[in-house]
Amino acid sequence: RKFYMSEFDKYIVQGEPDKKAKANAWQTAIGLQDVDGLKTSEYLIKTAVQHIEGDITISQVKDMLDDYYQVRGNREDIEKERTDEADKVSARITEMLLEKTFSFTPDFLLRIHQRLFEGIYKHAGAYRTVNISKKEWVLGGDTVMYSSYDMLRETLEYDFELEKRVDYNALNVDLAIKQICKFISGIWQIHPFREGNTRTTAVFTMKYLQTFGFTVNNDVFKDNSWYFRNALVRANYKNLPKGIHSTSDYLELFFRNLILGEKNVLSNRSMLVFESQSANKEVSKCQNGSLDCSLDELAVLRFLKENPDAKQTDIAKHIGKSERTIKRITPSLIERGLLERENGKRNGRWVVKCDI
C-alpha cells in the first residue's frame, strides 16, 4: 500500500494537470478495493505509472492486465486472493472516473456495474434474481434488510424520481449534504446486484457529485472506502428491541470531508453497534460551522479562491453552468458578504470572504 501511495503522490504534488488527474483516479480506484478487503498487485502499480506518464492508454492497461492473468500460473492463489479482480476493477474505475460522462438514470448505475465487473461476475450489469443477506462486522454479525429482488427496478426508479425533484439551489450546504446522503444510502440499501454494490455506488456517487460543478476530494474515498461501506450499513440498520436506530450521521461526516474538505475523524470502530447503542453519543461533531450557501455557490467560491482573476466565462466553464447562472450567483454572494470584488469590474480580482 505504501508503495503505490509514494509512486502516485509525486504526480499529485508536482505533476501536470493531466498526470495529476490520472494519479488521483488511480489512487481512488485502488483504495476502493478495500471495501471487499482486496489488494492490488505490484504489476498493476507499474502499469498504472506507465499510463500516468502517457506511455500507454487506459485501454492498453486493460489489455495488458487481461494478458497478464491469462498466462500467469498458480491460478488457485490468484482466485483465492482475488488479485485479478482488484487489478482489473481498479483499471476500469480509473477509466470511468476520467471520462466526462454521466446519466442520472438507474440504467447508468447498471452500466457502471457492467463495465466494472464484466468477465469477473457472471451477472455483471444485471439485477439480482434472489433475496440476499450479508453478515456485517459493524452490526456484530447481523444484516441490513435489502430490497426484495422482484421490486428492484421499481424501487430504483422511485428513488431516482424523488431525487430529480430536489431543488438543490434552495438548500444550503448542510441540507444538501443530508439530502445527498439520503439518496445515496437509499440506492445502496436497494442493493440491486449480487456483488459489487458498494464499489458501483461509490463510482456513481463521484460521477454524480461532479455534476454539481466542483471537484470533490476523492482522497476521502481512497483512504476511507471501508468506512463508507460501514456508514451505509448504519444508515440502513435499526434494531428497536436493542435500542438501535438507523442514523446517517456517520455518512454525513464522510460527505462533509468529501465535499467541504473537513477533517472529521472517520472511525470504523465508533460505528460498532455493540460499542454504544446511542449513535448521537458516538459521532464526532463536524469541525466547520454551517456555510449559508448552495452547492453551486460553494463551487463558485472554491473556484474563485483558487482563481481570483477569473472571468464570468471561466467560472461558467469550470463548474458547468451557464454564464447567466453565474451572473445571478456572484451578486448574491457579494450581497451576503461571502464574496468581494476589488478594484472594479474590468481589472479587479475576486476575494472570497469566508472560510471554505
Regions found by a protein language model. Give the residues of each.
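FIC/Doc superfamily catalytic core
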Residues: R1-I356
